[in-house]
């Protein structure tokens, strides 16, 4: 027998009237529901037993047949079949309508499908359906065309004139007739022909119409089925009616809606039978149409039908929509049995794989197992009495409970479950009380703390489920964070504090001899006798050598695995995590778990022994604070007076003040930490808590003992009045008031941002849920290049970290020997990465999900390593969901962390100079330099300084026996020459040899430092610069415009009162001339400098402050105007989350920058079209035409007449638009940009996410292409199509000898891409449910159930992990029902950390 769950795909389509009749078991003729006296369903009513089946099992309505033996008999008296009452959930009825009505989904949705087919607008359709206008069906010789609307008078006029030949109609009848007359095939052919004739068609409506026509043609649906003659009635159990106490009834809204339809339908039938006047009948028909509309989709109507208490009734569509709808409430998330929840408390005595389960809960959760066991042991004769025993809580029940619970894993979950580590499995240990006990080290993964958090517990029942739980979900298998491969189980808080105290060292008195010991036992004895302290320096004979260490460190080293290098340093939380990662790398998870439990024990033990506490005295305020604050006040005063004299603007003064306070705050913090460090011999508890990473950050301690510093307003602006006090001294009233801003913003943000982050995660999951690892190798030749990430000069992410866990895409070759070190497709482990780094590579090509060519999902080689286990990913791994969780989870975390600092603002100290931290040689200075009055070299346009790191330099005569030649690459430590005295000279770093003019140099990488206009250069080409020597100086607060020649100023299109505003500063009475936007007039503001016959023009952007008057004389290098840069706002993820959001949604930024479409030379024409300046780019290739570029007048242009630009360069200021990058620079550039930008936001917050997760999502955003030329394919121009389908179709057409289609890639944001998935189930359960289903039904779409969501919805196993196709045929055999047996466990011994297996044996 075929089970109803055994199918591969689901198709959705329009139902024909015959189909609806086929489903139905009878017609519902009366609006009655149940008889108020007998409470039995009324015959022919909405709950009729004859139609829908009996309400009592195996019993007919009248009671003639009353037992299972009459199964299938239909009662001759009442006509009810004797069957199960369950059939009332599946049997449908129908209502025969007296007049056809239109289905609201097809005429009211945008775009209206019916409207597209008939080429009518929604309003026209409505006026026909609602009996306002006639529509022409057959125009005869009237000269009108089919489908035109006419009013009553015209209709009668035409009738009189042309008689029966002229046919027009009104209402749904007419629409149905028109739809039935459409020849879908012919229409579609005609439109295709039209499109080809017109070429490059742009009318979207025609394309849309073609799409709908072809949908009907290909799906076998008939257009007239969109008009209903017969309405299905859903089974009564799905719209139940229940009796409340007090004899009243609660009913589903659908019953009310159905009743209205039946009432109106019956009334219409009567009126037609009575041959009532047309006007009355029409009104009734209109009301029937409205009733059916309300039944199908009440929320779409302007005035929804209201029920009791003025509440809109819930129609069939509303049942599906939204968070409370069928999809999201019941299909994607169900409540499950065998679960419980309780408060959690810490269980420091537990092992890493255990949890404490309260006996009360265990009794309920394991009830069936206990009952079965009681019967097996003959402690109860049958299940029923066993149940009684359990409920009475007899003594033997608890003995059995121990046995049943043993080795039966349970799952713990803490909401919100933001990533897969929010559910983990543990082995239960029974405990007294009512609270669940949780191991302290798994808290971080759950983001749990013990301030009243609750957790839910779930029991896996079947042997298969238990096995999976045990093998995959047990906490020891989840030590690493899937987002980045770092341990997530690191110790925190008291454990860290204990370990830090244990491994720290007391300062020893100078010259005092060290006590010596020969082994660990002696040291223990000495501690017990009080001869030495845990932190005293001693010397000890250990592992064959004499060490200088402390007893505490010796004790700590006993818990590390054998053979691990001796750890001889104080361990903060970061250090401990490093050791955990290292042990995992070298010894695997089993040893790591054992070590974790030992670390936990040690940490708690010694935190208790050393018992640090903090008192107010421990918060030491630095004595230097008063002086520093005094200096700052003087500097602020100075800035104020400069402003009053008019030397600087108010904005500059403000920035200066903020900078002064930021700097002062940093200085105070520094001196405070020095003070704390000296206090109590380096063991000040406040300092230790911060230093060890146990609690508190530098930020927080700075506020306790330094100064609170600058605060931000809710808008993110910084208040320039700094808070000079700290919490130890106490705040003044004003300071307290300023502080409240930040504190409140913190709380408000947390509430709002958590929802945003949750929604981001939901969209990410939705777009990437069907990315599953599907094959071993897709065989692509494509790859991406990954390299070091730098910020200025600092390496933020090393090459090793960047390429870890990827497969190489090319052979890695040793640059010295030219041998292949690692062939293509080598998995890059830490070791491999280190070696590649040592070879001097700063970037290599690796495989990536972005370039993977798998049909479904991605392949192992392109994805690389599974970050949660550091082994290659396996087929069936749901990498898409993991990627989504890895990106979404920190979003939520970070927003929840804003408020801990209490809104203290941090502004960057503005740099005024360019410098590098090493000795360098200036290779080149790009850009136009002019010499000003002070004879300084000034950049008059944007440019750059190219500097190369100088590693070593010798005169050639100082060297003998050169081993290298000019241009050769050298490695660190490579021998390059010997000196005359015979000493070896080796390279200090990887670099390249450079020999010229008798000088031998080893040079490192080049750095290009971009500089802005007005920068003063202090160096010349070929200068050798010292570390941190200022290379160039600039104004950090303003962008400037600089004159390139001496001459006289002439204002052009600058008029005071029109586009120049005179701002008088009230406090200083200085006058500022500021350029403002002028909408009405076509002004192109610029300043010209005229000298003899030559003139130079400079465009002046909006917001510029003009520094010269009309007619002034200026010298080359003088400033003509300044543009103040926007005040720095504080950046936290509050700014960050919206940024991630707009990147993933691919939104166009407000003021997008313009990119150069081609390489070429700029010509600024000076013409203005529609408030935009016009520029031309003359391409390098003379055959190409010049490219016109328009830029809004207000924007600052980055280029000048005669500049050369490269394709993709920014021409004006503004933010990059991802769509432009894709269009101009191509897919690769866009991918790199998106990954980098998203990483940037998270990196600012100190969150590590592996690139591959972001790549998986970006891959999904670039799935579609836009057809630009359809060739001989079945595509239409401007159609969006899946890239894979596009390639397949092209292959087919080429094979048949046709011309292939051409397309451009398009970028879709998360929401758009999710709604465009192949699976309509997935899209419908995401957003816009009715729209998706309408569309799918017309197209007759088939859902092949490839993704995870679709399968969850219909209750299949998901096609990932053990549900993958290739595992479908494997079955698990069990010798006994209940728990896992010994033999199974032995087979899997490898997978289960030894500690667990040992433990479980030892407890019996």
Curated annotation (Swiss-Prot):
It catalyses: RNA(n) + a ribonucleoside 5'-triphosphate = RNA(n+1) + diphosphate. SUPFAM superfamilies: beta and beta-prime subunits of DNA dependent RNA-polymerase. One of its GO terms (cellular component) is DNA-directed RNA polymerase complex. Residues 1381-1404 are annotated as: Disordered. Keywords: DNA-directed RNA polymerase, Magnesium, Metal-binding, Nucleotidyltransferase, Transcription, Transferase, Zinc. GO terms for molecular function: DNA binding; DNA-directed RNA polymerase activity; magnesium ion binding; zinc ion binding. Mg(2+) binds at residues 449, 451, 453. The keyword Metal-binding applies. Zn(2+) 2 binds at residues 778, 852, 859, 862. DNA-dependent RNA polymerase catalyzes the transcription of DNA into RNA using the four ribonucleoside triphosphates as substrates. Belongs to the RNA polymerase beta' chain family. This is DNA-directed RNA polymerase subunit beta'. It comes from Leptospira borgpetersenii serovar Hardjo-bovis (strain JB197).
